[in-house]
Amino acid sequence: MPKASEVKKNTAIEFNNNVYLIRDIERSVPQGRSGGSLYRMRMYDVATGSKLDHTFKADEMINLADLSRHEVSFSYIDGDEYVFMDIADYTPYHFNKDSIADEILFINEETQGLQVLTVDGTPVAIELPANVELVIVETDPSIKGASASARTKPAILSTGLSVQVPEYIANGEKIKINTAEHKFMSRADSK
């Protein structure tokens, strides 16, 4: 059993006789206390989808739920459902568009390293790779000789995600995006 300070995002825990998936963690250090940090966790019930916010002390022990990870690839869209296929055994996993709205901005047919998190065989979340490669579909024209400047411009990517990119980047280029920070990392390696 890990302490609250050791728990990460997208971890499934058992709390109040239910299984919750942690979506967000905020750490705070109260002033005037000699005690440790507090961790406010936003969790969603796996069965009902209801939201729960709870604050744990840093050294409070948390029970982990039985969570499995399955490497998947994006398969197709069926109405409001996104379907992902298990790479090992071709099991389809269906997600409602609203439940993975943040992740959709980083997913296309070529995205590799996706994982579906399941609790007792039920898919509960999509875990993104650390970075993804996406194509710029709309940005201001590139400026020659601008590589030395640190100025940026907005760019819209093939999935609809908007990020700031350096001025020397042009339409049609494939770039690497950090999925945790939603930031430009570099040009993608041309293969």
From Swiss-Prot:
InterPro entries: Elong-fact-P_C, NA-bd_OB-fold, Rib_uL2_dom2, Transl_elong_fac_P/YeiP, Transl_elong_KOW-like, Transl_elong_p-like_YeiP, Transl_elong_P/YeiP_cen, Transl_elong_P/YeiP_CS. It holds the Pfam family EFP_N. GO terms for cellular component: cytoplasm. GO terms for biological process: peptide biosynthetic process. It comes from the Bacteria. GO terms for molecular function: translation elongation factor activity. SUPFAM superfamilies: Nucleic acid-binding proteins (SSF50249), Translation proteins SH3-like domain (SSF50104). Disulfide bonds: none annotated. Belongs to the elongation factor P family. PANTHER family: ELONGATION FACTOR P, TRANSLATION ELONGATION FACTOR KOW-LIKE DOMAIN-CONTAINING PROTEIN. NCBIfam families: PRK00529.1 (NF001810), PRK04542.1 (NF003392), yeiP (TIGR02178). This is Elongation factor P-like protein. The lineage of its organism: Bacteria, Pseudomonadati, Pseudomonadota, Gammaproteobacteria, Alteromonadales.
